[in-house]
Amino acid sequence: MKNRKFSNLLLLRLRILCFNKKPAFAATSYAFFFRNFSVLIFIMVPDEKENGAAADNSFSLLIGRGVVLFLFYCPTALKMHGPVPAHWFCDKNIEAIQSDGQIRLLRSGPFPWSHGTCIRGA
């Protein structure tokens, strides 16, 4: 029963890539939607194209390079009225999580708190 509940909480896994002139990193995000809050876990790794090395996305090598985890707790008020703080990761284009599980490409500059994609719990 608990395993089934946990599997229902994991709604979406997506890859986010920031499209700047020289991308600094790629990020993989895991979204967990709980009753009163949501948790986004971002795993960020440096883009090795900057260093001229071949990029290898195997999980063991990512851990060897130093994986940085970011957790974002989204209270009920923010879930209903506020977006994911995407300006932490990219200031141009980003794929955002919508409440129905779809992905939307934003084309604005720095992500404002006044509008954008809301994350809503189950």
UniProtKB/Swiss-Prot annotation:
UniProt topological domain (Cytoplasmic) ranges: 1-24, 79-122
Transmembrane segments: 25-45, 58-78
Highest rank taxon of the organism: Eukaryota
Protein name: Uncharacterized membrane protein YOR376W
Compartment(s) where it occurs, according to its Swiss-Prot or TrEMBL record: Membrane
CC per GO annotation: membrane
Extracellular compartment spans: 46-57
Keyword vocabulary terms for this entry: Membrane, Transmembrane, Transmembrane helix
Membrane topology note: Multi-pass membrane protein
Keyword Protein transport: no
